[in-house]
Amino acid sequence: MKILTETPISRPANGIPDVNYIENDGGAPSLCRKLNKALEWANEQGADWLCWHHDDLEIQTPELVEPNLRRAYTDGARVAGVIGALAVFVPQWWMNNRPVMTWGAIIQGYKDGREQLMADQPGYNPNMAIVDGCALWIHRDMFDARVEDYVNHLYDDDICFRALQRGYKVACLDVRCKHLSEGGYEFRDYQEASDRFMDYWRARAEFPVISGQKFKEVK
């Protein structure tokens, strides 16, 4: 299995070797454009899977990645992650129906040194609606997909929806990761991206979006 790893930030990531840094050039000033560039590059390299993750994410059990990906592929998944949602009502899925609709586990680190285990429903699940973009594995069957440009937001929701739209599944892997960043964003920028995301996908899907549902034809 050939897994290529790319990160949109410059610091080397722990847990997986041969990380390729996506620079802010070549028309890729946003995380969405960077992901599209990464998909194009992975396709050119003949990879089986693209591993896309933030530079501040540490994969603590890298030996479990390939077995989980084989299982996910067999189950029909072409996008995978480590934590996500079983249904999407609006893009801000962390703020809705947690812990009922979230699945997976991740160790979240904070700037003051604290750590919190987020594990509402840990373990493997091949029936996700979306998985979080801090760690994504995308199969070559999706390398021709391109996400809409929401600048630095919602690329994870978009690539997951595109997999579901094609009849594939999205899986949560049983892989332990530690995300060192506290995250954060300008709410106004996020809200603008969210509005554009919903305008695009409301024309193509019935909300809430869940695994296995049919998407609309758009002419």
Task: Explain the meaning of each model-derived region.
Residues 1-24:
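N-proximal low-complexity "stem/linker" segments adjacent to membrane-targeting elements
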Residues 26-35, 39, 152-153:
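A short, glycine-/small-residue-rich helix N-cap motif at loop->alpha-helix starts
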Residues 36-49:
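Active-site nucleotide-sugar/metal-binding loop of Leloir-type enzymes
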Residues 47-58:
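Short beta-strand-to-loop acidic/aromatic patch adjacent to the donor-nucleotide binding site
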Residues 57-71:
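Acidic donor-binding/catalytic loop of UDP-sugar-dependent glycosyltransferases
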Residues 68-144:
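Conserved catalytic core of nucleotide-sugar-dependent glycosyltransferases
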